[in-house]
């Protein structure tokens, strides 16, 4: 994560302070140079004539106060120059700090631009993925609808098959019941036939003997649709 750079307002204030300090330093240097030139010109001025060479009625001018004033001004100019030098050094330090801050701002701006480009690329990729996911969701929705329709149809077919199986089971049970009833009837007829045969054997052989008709006897295995095999009579 990039560290936040200095505030732009503070950078501009420091830059304005630096410019003002440079201007004041130049003005003070100019004032000091003027004072220095004035003092030098005063020192180079010709000496006053000797008192004996001057007219007794003319009083020599007293230049001591002017020299003291010039010295005072020179000292003030030197002090101002020192102050301006200090301010100039401080302004140079502020300038270096501003340059470092501006460089940090440029680096931060470059990093932010790089991150912005990366974010734009990610946004474009996210849009593409969103479109693809929308298409996939549409396909999945259609597949789900088809699956639900197939499941409903399969459920209906299963219910119909269960109904048919129940009907077939009921029909099978009814068929088994009919088969059992027919077998019992067959067994009864066979028992009756056996009894008739025994009675015919015990009768005398004279006279004609009529055979009992067994045309009403059902054939074994005549019932169709029942799966149980016929039971052999004991």
Swiss-Prot record:
Residues 44-63, 194-234 are annotated as: Disordered. Residues 203-219 have a biased composition (Basic residues). Residues 67-171 form a coiled coil. Keywords: Coiled coil, Signal. Disulfide bonds: none annotated. Residues 1-43 form the signal peptide. It comes from the Eukaryota. The keyword Membrane does not apply. The keyword Signal applies. This is Coiled-coil domain-containing protein 194.
């Amino acid at each position: 994560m990039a560290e936040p750079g200095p505030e732009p307002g503070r950078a501009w204030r420091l830059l304005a302070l630096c410019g003002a300090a440079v201007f004041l330093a130049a003005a003070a240097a100019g004032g000091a140079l003027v004072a220095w030139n004035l003092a030098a010109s005063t020192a180079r001025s010709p000496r006053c004539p000797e008192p004996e060479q001057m007219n007794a009625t003319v009083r020599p001018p007293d230049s001591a106060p002017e020299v003291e004033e010039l010295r005072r001004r020179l000292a003030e100019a030197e002090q101002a120059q020192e102050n301006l030098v200090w301010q100039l050094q401080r302004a140079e330090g502020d300038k270096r700090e501003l340059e470092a801050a501006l460089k940090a701002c440029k680096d931060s701006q470059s990093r932010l631009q790089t991150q912005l480009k990366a974010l734009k690329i990610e946004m474009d990729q996210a849009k593409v993925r969103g479109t693809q996911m929308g298409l996939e969701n549409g396909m999945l929705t259609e597949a789900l609808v088809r699956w639900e329709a197939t499941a409903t149809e399969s459920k209906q077919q299963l219910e119909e098959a269960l109904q048919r199986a129940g009907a077939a089971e009921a029909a099978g049970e009814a068929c088994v019941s009919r088969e059992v009833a027919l077998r019992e009837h067959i067994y009864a007829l066979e028992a009756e036939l056996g009894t008739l045969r025994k009675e015919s054997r015990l009768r005398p052989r004279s006279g004609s003997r009529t055979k009992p008709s067994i045309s009403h006897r059902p054939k074994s295995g005549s019932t169709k649709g029942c799966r149980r095999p016929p039971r052999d009579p004991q």
